[in-house]
Amino acid sequence: MSRLAILLAAVVAGCGRPRVSSVEWLAMGTVAKVSFKCGGCDASAQRNAGAIAREAYARVEDRLSVWNPKSEISNYTSVEAVSPDMRPCYEMAFDVQRKSGGAFNPFWRGNGKGPDLGGIAKGFAVDMAAKRLEAVGIGREGDVLLDLGGNLKAVSGVWRTGIRDPSGLGGIVQTLTLSNGMACATSGEYERGKHIRDGRTGIPVSNDVASVTVVHPSSATVADALSTVLFVLGRADGDDFLKRHYPDAFAVWVMRDANGRD
């Protein structure tokens, strides 16, 4: 459930460093960006990549928006009845729900309402866009990074990203390197206040975690879901959960002190 928590800080340094250019727009209620790093970036390839990602994000939003009464998820009956290309998102959400004991809970709204995949949908959309870009060969001639509201995936190449200070004071608390398929997502308070709820109680989370970033070797979907789970569980239980169920992922924690400061 990334909330603009991670931003691109810099590309990996080197002699004759390639130029970075981006295509940017609004999607799924946040900022979407496709960044390119190459010696002679082809403008038409960039536009094509932006169009492909835009189409992927629009499809996910059209199917998974709980705010649209006509969307597929608003009329959910069973996972077997959903569109085949959306089914992996449901299945992953339900799997994480089971493993986390409900800390991640697509049915947190209760009262017989259907699932809400907001805690995983943006990561899923990034993975869908990445697959479509790879299918047409975008990324072979240069490095490509997808960013959907802080859900990042390095489609190709090596990228450096910075975890923004969740206190709102600005600055970067730690840098990360993503390469060739790696993805990351962050959950924290940031601009939107207490938006993260414990799926077991429906109550906004209140603990000593300021933010947690999860890096996964291949899945933005998994990183998105796990960042929410770990924020809810807290550091001790979160680290244990990660080791038991997702040992190929790792977390970067930013904690509050006894006075509530980051």
Write out the residue ranges for each language-model feature.
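Mature catalytic core of soluble alpha/beta enzymes
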Residues: 3-262
